[in-house]
Amino acid sequence: MEGINNNSQPMGVGQPHHPVNHTRPFFYVQPPSQPYFMYQWPMNPYGHYGFPGPALHFGRPYMAPYQFMQYPGYVIPHAPMQPIDYRRINPHYPSVASYDLRVRHHFQNAGMHRETACSEVQTDPSDSVNKLIDKIESLKACELGSDKGPNNVVSSTPDVVQGEKLTRLNEDSNLEVATKECKEDPVTRPTTYSDSAYDAESSQGRLDECVFSDVLPLDSSSVHEEEEEEEKDVNEEDEPQTVADEICSQNEMSASTTSNVFCSGVQSIADPTECHDLEKLGDEQKQDIPSADAAAVIEPLISLSEDFDLPYQILRLPCNKTTTGLSLEREIDPLVYFDSPSTLLPPQNYLSSIGSAYSYSYYPQVTQERQSVLSPSIDELSSRDEMFSTDVEDLEVVPGHVYVGGGRLAEASDMPVRSRKELPSVDKTCSVCQKTCACCGSTLQDEVGMCKMAEHSHPERDEMSDQDCDYDLEAEVRSNCESPRVSKRKCCSRHALPSCGHHCAKHRHRKLLCEGQESCDLREQARVHPKGECCEEYGALAKADKRIQKGALCRPCIEQQWREGVVSDQENWASCGAKPRSWRQVTGPQDQGRTPLRRSTCKSIHQQRPRSEYNDYDETEFTYCQRGRGSMKKRGSRY
């Protein structure tokens, strides 16, 4: 028993125990620790029981002040994770009250200290406000220090200052500063020459002045001071030594400002020989820069930064008239010089035609632009195979620029646009032009002849349906020989009722003018040129496919239609000027070579859906006349 007691003593929870002799086994009973939660990863601090926050989010922290809470009745499955001892994360010493959920509100916000503040109760200024106040005070001190001379033009606020006043004020100041500094020893010059130190904050205000006063700011003042000295060389030729000293000091300033941007005082070049070399370089540079009024305005604004001893520097700022939106008079880089400002100006075609403040438009004007949202361009038309009749009214697809007029699409091309009222007269006057098949090279005229006689038979009833027939025949030949176009099959009703022509007149304007024009040419050519066998077979197959799409017909109606088409074709070839018989006549020989082939093709396909005799003859003609090229539904009732 003694060994057992001794062995059981280290079995505690880790608290130090002195070895004590016990007569019986014992256990140290301690409050249970925080449970190990197996679902670890969604641990939203504002979700209950470790569940994902969006599911149960009521603004309460995840870990309750007491660590022994009742688990919910359901558990959300999570990825397998290693258990974590949360006692090391959130140590907690449970109390008696923590075991009861009714008193959980006593421990809900324990240990949470938050400080909130809004802008209405903040009395102390923030750090940014303090920094701003300090900067303003430092600027005021700099202004007071520069009030000793009459050349105080530094302002803590960006004011728009006139260029003439700045020019007059800084000519004297630059002369005095330059002569004074060049007369000093080269050794003491780096330490005493603190007037050329760049000042960031006052130059920022000066930068705003440049923007407001339509002046192009630069990052160095040596260019403008050399331009000043170029003017002074003309006026003060009796003082060559003074001018040389000024150029020497200015070149030192330019050399030092481009090399030193870290200290408030600019290090100048101490070797006088280098000063003379820079003087020669400055003379050469002066000749390259043309004097202009813009330069005279720009000079004093940048040279102001050297007149006052401020602990700041002007760095290279990417600010010019192009980016600030002001008129671009001249853009000068202090290290690169151009003979004329034409190298910096954009070309004339980029200039904005509006005359606004911007120097040029970032986007050049497009040569051909969309005139309307509803008007497709030629590129869009060429990308498609065809514009359907349900999309655009009266369109003639010829290369050219599309113009919009009267709500329709017109075309600025050599071929005139003809309305649908002019088409019957155009059929008689169109010039004969050779049209060949793109596949076989044969002419495409024979099939149009079967509907040519329509304009001599009934000008009010048959002319409209025949014109639609010409549309369809020409579209079929083109669809089978040139490109895969979607076109309507023959809509000429062989048993036309008096209202059939009226329906055709309603929907005839849905055709494209392109097809109407080409069908006019094809009709005239039908008298001269025969048609190739390749195109005949293509037309037969195409009509068979289209009849499948539009709806199956019974056999007698199809045979009757083809018989009438053959008879009409023969009469049209025999006597073109005579008035042929009406379309209603059914009988006629079938001696055309292509007719048996086409009949057999249609006969083998269109026997799928038989109808009554009345519906066959009556509904067929209405269906053909009422359907548009891209439509599959009836457009009106039969009665």
Swiss-Prot record:
Primary residence: cytoplasm
Motif (RG Motif 3): 635-636
Task of the protein: Prion-like protein required for the formation of Balbiani body (electron-dense aggregates in the oocyte) and germ plasm assembly, and for the establishment of oocyte polarity during early oogenesis. Mobility and aggregation properties are improved by tudor domain-containing protein tdrd6 through interaction with dimethylated arginines Tri-RG domains. Establishes oocyte polarity through interactions with RNA-binding proteins rbpms2 and dazl, initiating a positive feedback loop amplification mechanism in the Balbiani body.
Motif (RG Motif 2): 629-630
PTM summary: Symmetric dimethylarginine modification promotes interaction with tdrd6.
Domain writeup: The dimethylated RG motifs (RG[X0-4]RG[X0-4]RG) motif mediates interaction with TDRD6 and is required for Balbiani body formation.
Subunit (UniProt): Specifically interacts (when methylated) with tdrd6 (via Tudor domain); interaction is responsible for recruitment of different protein complexes to germ plasm. Interacts with rbpms2 and dazl; interaction mediates Balbiani body formation. Interacts with kif5ba; interaction leads to buc enrichment at the embryonic cleavage furrows and mediates dorsoventral patterning.
Localization, UniProt: Cytoplasm; Cleavage furrow
GO BP term, pick one: oocyte animal/vegetal axis specification
Region (Disordered): 178-205, 218-242, 581-614
Compositional bias (Acidic residues): 225-240
Organism placement in taxonomy: Eukaryota, Metazoa, Chordata, Craniata, Vertebrata
Positions where Symmetric dimethylarginine occurs in the chain: 627, 629
Cytoplasm in keyword set: yes
Keyword field contains Zinc-finger: no
Protein name stated in the entry: Bucky ball
GO CC entries: cleavage furrow; cytoplasm
Keywords: Cytoplasm, Differentiation, Methylation, Oogenesis, Spermatogenesis
Motif position, RG Motif 1: 627-628
Composition skew (Basic and acidic residues), residue ranges: 178-187
Species of provenance: Danio rerio
Outcome of gene disruption: Mutant fails to form Balbiani body, and vegetal mRNAs are not localized in oocytes.
Ranges annotated as biased composition (Polar residues): 189-205, 584-593
Ranges of compositional bias, category Basic residues: 596-609
Matching InterPro entries: Balbiani_Body_Formation (IPR053309)
